[in-house]
């Protein structure tokens, strides 16, 4: 009697079967390729061969036949789950080292579980129909990894997640090759980094030819030369501290490509704090390296808008799944939260972060109360997976060695190599701004009057409420003048259009008055240049970043002016912002606020005020956890709970779609039953965050309507072309940085 084929997949287009044997072997080949690249030979083969053994269950075979209208013997099934079987076999084959693979095997569909869930899984009986013939031998655990994990127990969770990444990406890729062959063909065909380095060198040479021999351009050339020299160094952790205007972005990319080529890396990753910076950085890189070599990946991205060619858009969409691309431009949220994720979609990319070069732009924006797990994750990727890191900013945080906090220590990186010698004194040579700290507090009317006296001015404040109050008090702009408001009361689409309009207006004849009132979303990295900047009191890093928008290009005949002020009756919001402001006030007044030593002193004071570098947050049961409690005990790893807890930005609000431009038409399509991921992603560009309490107020007033799980503002009078959502309530006091 012919043995019945164990089915893994059925291609719907032609009802072709893929046997479980073929699928497992295919996954094993992919996974072995990936695990060898992370120094774990044999592990990919082991994982691939075991991961779908559970599909041999009668119940699963009945299920897959019923779902595809294939006749079955029994006609029904009780339990189609299958992932747990691979974990059971790993436990049987590999009793001492099974946790290395059991988490990945048990979670290759639903996500890596907590240890208690894994224990329950391993109590299940092994189904009698599972064949024990031809099972793979258990691989050896490399001695170097064992040594590293004994000295740093937190490294284990990242190693297991990396193995998981290798397995789930292999599983997806083999399944795609069988089920969607046209899609699979779109992967690959990437330009190597040598060619991209050549394109950058050509671009820099053209820039040098076209640029006058000014002191600023001489400094930019000097910074580039320092990056060339440093890039020859070993795989390591580096910093690039360059004042605004010193050519930091292209110099850091030059360093990354040179370093990557020297050490045989496959990609460079630019991690950026704000989507407003990503958009401009990605545009610059696409112009240099070509559309086909730069992958932009963040929550607000619409590939069909960025890429005109449908095939190119699809290729990039596929690349966002696993980051198999030479240059990635992404957010800190996307990168760092993936390193603590537990589900396949977020973890697929992790093995492609191994053997890469990561640039962290505006490093001072990394959240202080998450610094310990961030440092530990990056330290692991450096030590176990040969990743080089470069932290770039004009306001470098102190992340090396032991740093004293209020009640605990921050255990920083072992060593960070600074590229620019202190003796160069770039902060003096690139000085373009004079800081002035106003002693007396000032009210909304007075600050608005001050702004009206300026021809071109940027005012940055701490909260959405303050931005709205000051903007509303500006007099009507005189003929030919422009007034702009920027805050997260505006949806991303609205913000981007306004930012673009501001940049275009600033490039016009200098006689055009331009006044901008903004929250801190334009503070770091946004390419704007004003002769005068006002900054509400804040930490020194924020003040210097704001000053970086002042006389940015050094075109003024004298120093630009940055005014730091206190708002009457408006203290700095509690929490990190308040600690930052207090740290600045606690400092002895330095001779030069822009000197690197001033920033070192500031961060020393700042860290002393931080209550924790590993903040506790509630899981879905309301229990408080820190990452140390969840992932630093090798016998009690809690991957699923850590995924819930680790959020770089508090995201406790509710997204509400605003009636702005295209969103009105998109809403109609949703109401007509068009439910797909592309439409939902487009709508995300038109959302503003509300707290639960304010959402209820809007709902009760009939101004918001739920449609297919999304909330829509239906009262268009509540959304203004200038300021976005009009709502005078306490929650506008909250800061929101994305």
PLM regions: where:
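Accessory nucleic-acid engagement/destabilization modules that flank
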Residues: 2-202
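Conserved helicase motor
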Residues: 8-12, 296-310, 462-465, 483-501, ...
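Walker A/P-loop
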Residues: 234-256
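Conserved Walker A/P-loop ATP-binding site and its immediately adjacent core
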Residues: 265-289, 298-301, 398
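Inter-Walker segment of RecA-like/P-loop motor cores
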Residues: 290-340
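SF2 helicase catalytic motif II
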Residues: 333-336, 346-384
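C-terminal helicase lobe and adjacent C-terminal extensions/tails of nucleic-acid helicase motors
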Residues: 382, 445-446, 452-454, 465, ...
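Interdomain hinge/linker at the junction between the two RecA-like core domains of SF2 helicases
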Residues: 395-452
């Amino acid at each position: 009697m012919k043995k019945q084929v164990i089915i893994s997949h059925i291609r719907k287009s032609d009802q072709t079967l893929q046997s479980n044997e073929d699928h497992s072997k295919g996954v094993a080949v992919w996974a072995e390729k990936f695990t060898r690249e992370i120094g774990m030979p044999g592990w990919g083969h082991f994982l691939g061969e075991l991961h779908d053994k559970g599909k041999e269950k009668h119940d699963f075979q009945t299920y897959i036949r019923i779902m595809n209208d294939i006749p079955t013997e029994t006609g029904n099934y009780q339990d189609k789950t299958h992932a747990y079987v691979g974990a059971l076999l790993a436990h049987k084959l590999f009793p001492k080292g099974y946790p290395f693979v059991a988490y990945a095997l048990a979670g290759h569909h639903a996500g890596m579980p907590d240890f208690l869930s894994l224990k329950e899984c391993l109590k299940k009986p092994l189904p009698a129909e599972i064949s024990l013939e031809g099972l793979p031998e258990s691989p050896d655990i490399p001695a170097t990894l064992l040594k590293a994990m004994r000295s740093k127990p937190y490294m284990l969770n990242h190693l297991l997640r990396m193995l998981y990444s290798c397995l789930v990406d292999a599983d997806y890729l083999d399944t795609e090759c069988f089920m969607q062959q046209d899609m699979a063909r779109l992967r690959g065909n990437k330009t190597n980094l040598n060619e991209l380095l050549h394109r950058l060198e050509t671009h820099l040479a053209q820039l040098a030819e076209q640029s006058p021999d000014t002191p600023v351009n001489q400094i930019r050339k000097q910074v580039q030369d320092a990056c060339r020299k440093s890039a020859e160094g070993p795989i390591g952790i580096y910093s690039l501290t360059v004042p605004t205007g010193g050519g930091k972005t292209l110099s850091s990319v030059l360093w990354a490509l040179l370093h990557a080529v020297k050490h045989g890396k496959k990609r460079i990753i630019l991690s950026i704090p704000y989507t407003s910076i990503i958009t401009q950085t990605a545009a610059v890189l696409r112009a240099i390296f070509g559309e086909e070599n730069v992958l932009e990946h963040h929550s607000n991205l619409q590939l069909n808008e960025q890429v005109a060619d449908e095939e190119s858009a699809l290729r990039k969409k596929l690349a966002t799944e696993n980051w198999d691309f030479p240059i990635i431009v992404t957010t800190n949220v996307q990168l760092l939260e993936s390193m603590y994720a537990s589900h396949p979609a977020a973890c697929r990319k992790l093995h492609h972060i191994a053997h890469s070069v990561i640039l962290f732009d505006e490093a001072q924006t990394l959240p202080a109360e998450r610094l310990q797990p961030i440092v530990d994750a990056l330290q692991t990727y450096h030590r176990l997976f040969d990743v080089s890191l470069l932290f770039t900013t004009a306001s470098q945080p102190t992340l090396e060695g032991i740093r004293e906090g209020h009640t605990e220590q921050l255990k920083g990186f072992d060593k960070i190599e600074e590229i620019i010698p202190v003796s160069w004194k770039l902060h003096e040579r690139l000085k373009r701004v004079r800081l002035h700290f106003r002693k007396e507090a000032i009210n909304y009317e007075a600050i608005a009057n001050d702004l009206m006296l300026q021809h071109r001015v940027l005012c940055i404040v701490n909260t959405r409420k303050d931005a709205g109050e000051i903007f509303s008090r500006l007099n009507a702009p005189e003929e030919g003048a422009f007034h702009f408001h920027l805050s997260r009361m505006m949806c991303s689409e609205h913000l981007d259009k306004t930012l673009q309009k501001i940049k275009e207006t600033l490039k016009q004849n200098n006689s055009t008055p331009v006044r901008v009132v903004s929250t801190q979303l334009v503070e770091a990295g946004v390419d704007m240049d004003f002769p005068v900047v006002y900054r509400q009191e804040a930490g020194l890093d924020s003040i210097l970043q704001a000053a970086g928008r002042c006389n940015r290009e050094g075109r003024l005949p004298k120093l630009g002016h940055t005014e730091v002020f206190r708002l009457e009756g408006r203290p700095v919001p509690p929490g990190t912002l308040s600690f930052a402001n207090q740290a600045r006030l606690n400092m002895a007044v330095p001779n030069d606020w822009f000197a690197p030593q001033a920033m070192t002193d500031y961060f020393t004071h700042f860290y002393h005020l931080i209550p924790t570098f590993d903040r506790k947050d509630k899981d879905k049961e309301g229990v408080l956890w820190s990452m140390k409690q969840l992932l630093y005990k090798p016998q009690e790893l809690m991957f699923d709970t850590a995924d819930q807890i680790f959020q770089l930005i508090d995201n406790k609000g509710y997204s509400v779609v605003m009636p702005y431009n295209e969103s009105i038409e998109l809403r109609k399509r949703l109401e007509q039953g068009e439910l797909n991921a592309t439409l939902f992603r487009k709508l995300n560009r038109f959302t503003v965050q509300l707290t639960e309490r304010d959402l209820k107020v809007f709902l009760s007033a009939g101004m918001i309507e739920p449609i297919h799980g999304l909330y829509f503002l239906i009262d268009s009078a509540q959304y203004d072309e200038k300021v976005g959502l009009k709502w005078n309530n306490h929650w506008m006091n909250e800061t929101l940085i994305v």
